[in-house]
């Protein structure tokens, strides 16, 4: 089975309503709101892109015929709701152009939409530009996924040049850059480091959704790394970590 299809199959198998730390968060009530509902405007800006509301469809999949259908359907949803959307990692298409249409289908379906390309942090500037040009992406997501790579049987084991590559991409592309986590959360120290590299937009996606350590461990013959299934910080913890760095990014 294609690895991308395997990821989707396992994500479905492991999908469940997990406990979420947002359930423990209580919003402080304001007894004196002094606002009219007609004055409320949900428009916001992410990475210089204006959105109708603070919501978008994040990176999921691509790289096979089955995932092409998923991306087609996601793009249809994005078009009908006027949402920004990101492709899954386009690394498969950069290695094999025959797989490109599983990503470009999003632009075919949603030509006027805001669509983000997605590549890993170990990607060169030249490859990053290829990813952007593949379907004229409006911005580039650069994902950090070291835990996934370490658990993945065929994953990368060398992350020593990530910061160098991130800086090159930050300085060398003509569209906005978003550095994102893939469900392991973010720390204040990492946010500080990324800001020093010129990164202005950071997606702090934390634990409680799809677990790529769980998915990759299920692909291992012995499944011996199950203790890493819940690795990382939650999004709530990551938000607290990010709070002190708001002035930087």
Residue ranges and their predicted role:
Residues 41-43, 101, 124-128:
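Short alpha-helical segments and helix-capping/turn motifs at coil-helix boundaries
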Residues 66-67, 94-98, 186:
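Secondary-structure boundary/capping motif
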Residues 45-92:
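Active-site cofactor/substrate anionic-group-binding motifs, chiefly glycine-
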Residues 69-75, 99-102, 131:
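"Short basic amphipathic alpha-helical interaction patches in structured regions
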Residues 75-80, 111-116, 121-249:
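Alpha/beta enzyme core
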Residues 82-119:
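A gly/proline- and charged-residue-enriched helix-loop-helix capping module
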Residues 68-69, 97, 152-156:
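Short, solvent-exposed loop/turn segments at secondary-structure boundaries
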Residues 1-47, 51:
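An N-cap/entry alpha-helix motif that binds or orients negatively charged groups
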